[in-house]
Amino acid sequence: MAGSGGLGGGAGDLQGAGTGQGTALRALRAPLALVVLLLSAYCLFALPGRCPPAARAPAPVPAPAEPPHTSLRLRAPGLPVASGPGRRRFPQALIVGVKKGGTRALLEFLRLHPDVRALGSEPHFFDRCYDRGLAWYRGLMPRTLDGQITMEKTPSYFVTQEAPRRIHGMSPDTKLIVVVRNPVTRAISDYAQTLSKTPGLPSFRALAFRHGLGPVDTAWSAVRIGLYAQHLDNWLRYFPLSHFLFVSGERLVSDPAGEVGRVQDFLGLKRVVTDKHFYFNATKGFPCLKKAQGSGRPRCLGKSKGRPHPRVPEAVVQRLQAFYRPFNRKFYQMTGQDFGWD
């Protein structure tokens, strides 16, 4: 009986211990879940767009030229594909960069041209979705008639190591457009976008530098994207400089018609989009499109464009300007253009 009592007492102790441990674990779950939630939100908004799910899986082989009156019906939900006459082709021109440089504005301005057909959403094919295959990619494109240009824009291509080789594999004749902007203001704009979606981030200064105002942290993507010369070096291994057009993000704001005119020349298009299509919106501090014939009102980019930047201490700005200066000068030499950032 004594042995039986001893076993009974042991079972009671274990049951009590198990209850205590369960209570402690439940108490830890709430803050742990909150941490996981915040980290997930940061990753969602700080990383480039994710690969959209495919409607059906195409054969992973390069796609031959599409015969007339046929089309691939493979596409991703959420990426609208225009219907109608014509056929789907691989893009002859790509806006490959850079994030927060003005790529969305340029794409919307170019879409005014009757000979430009462009995918509105960013497919992220050459950086995140390449395993879907070229047939899948072509199936996303809008239909075009002979003489029209197919385009898409994904700004993260410019900083993706594998993108130049992959694009060259699709077509070595692809024309490449890079919209660049002062890398300091670009980084602040990048941070402002992430902060608007993920409140509670560390300060810009804390992310840009190690140990206060120590070395610049080039591991942070907002800083790394602005090393334009380094990224261009990678692209020039596959494409000659003549295949590139570098658009000034600053001039795209101050003189949109002039910059869009250069792009139309580069694409071999007639200058259809001119200053008559633009007006400057003083509230947004950004050019908007005048209303087209039959349209009810002028069209500006979304509310996320032209958002106010957080205040960044002048010492931080000056340190970053000094850091970028040699990279900027090399970029000027490589492109033959002085963008006036120094």
Curated annotation (Swiss-Prot):
Sites where a glycan is attached: N281
Species for this entry: Mus musculus (Mouse)
Protein name (record): Heparan sulfate glucosamine 3-O-sulfotransferase 6
One of the GO BP terms on file: heparan sulfate proteoglycan biosynthetic process
Gene assigned in the entry: Hs3st6
Keywords: Disulfide bond, Glycoprotein, Golgi apparatus, Membrane, Signal-anchor, Transferase, Transmembrane, Transmembrane helix
Function comment: Sulfotransferase that utilizes 3'-phospho-5'-adenylyl sulfate (PAPS) to catalyze the transfer of a sulfo group to heparan sulfate. Unlike 3-OST-1, does not convert non-anticoagulant heparan sulfate to anticoagulant heparan sulfate.
Stated family: Belongs to the sulfotransferase 1 family.
InterPro entries: NST/OST, P-loop_NTPase, Sulfotransferase_dom
Tissue: Expressed in liver and kidney, followed by heart, brain, lung and testis.
